[in-house]
A protein has these predicted regions:
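Histidine-centered metal-chelating micro-motifs
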Residues: 111, 131-132, 136-141, 161
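N-terminal capping/interface segment
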Residues: 1-15
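Trp-centered recognition loops
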Residues: 128
Length: 192
């Protein structure tokens, strides 16, 4: 899909409440596609016996992967949990590791979990009306800790690419789970 003239100026609609765009290409991720990414795979299987919930979707414009352009779009991460672990995006490094990304939270609340190849981790809150800068060299994953969809606008260098494979093997070193006191970041048991 490439409906836009990327060597010219154009405008595109994005609904600021729900992140949808009539002109963007939508990709949906269901629990069945992500069940191995949650630490409690038994809880995931139990949910899948009843339904296959939509965990998140993103809307992008099909920007060519070339230097100098900016890819942008929206992510809608729905509320929910697998066991005690909150719904999350798959997360990724960029193929060009030295690429940063910016997320602007349009609605909802959550957390961005980040880690670099050396194992350093950080977590930052995602709050409506705030922009979050994800530094270069950091894999990043959004987590919805609220009761409503977490809606974010994102942008990054179009030639950066996505590396999902590195994360798919063991997941992130840290995960976000519900405790009596609220959302808590813990070590991922899969890294033990």
């Amino acid at each position: 899909m490439n409906r836009f003239q990327w060597d010219s100026s154009f405008s595109v609609d994005f609904n600021l409440q729900n992140g949808f765009s009539e002109k963007a290409e939508t990709t949906k991720r269901y629990l069945s596609q992500m069940k191995e990414m949650f630490y409690d795979t038994n809880a995931a299987e139990k949910i899948l016996e009843q339904e296959d919930p939509l965990v998140y979707e993103f809307h992008e414009l099909g920007c060519p992967m070339r230097e100098g352009d900016l890819a942008f779009g929206t992510t809608i991460l729905y509320p929910g949990k697998v066991g005690k672990e909150y719904f999350m995006t798959k997360g990724h490094f960029h193929t060009i590791l030295d690429t940063a990304e910016v997320y602007y939270t349009l609605d909802g609340e959550g957390c961005m979990i980040m880690e670099n190849p050396e194992g350093e981790t950080m977590e930052m809150p995602l709050k409506k009306g705030e922009a979050l800068y994800v530094p270069r060299r950091y894999a990043h994953r959004s987590v919805n800790t609220g009761d409503t969809p977490l809606v974010m606008f994102f942008t990054f260098a179009a030639n950066a690419g996505h590396d999902y494979g590195t994360i798919e093997t063991k997941g992130y070193r840290k995960i976000l789970v519900e405790k009596e006191c609220g959302p808590v970041v813990i070590d991922n048991p899969k890294w033990s």
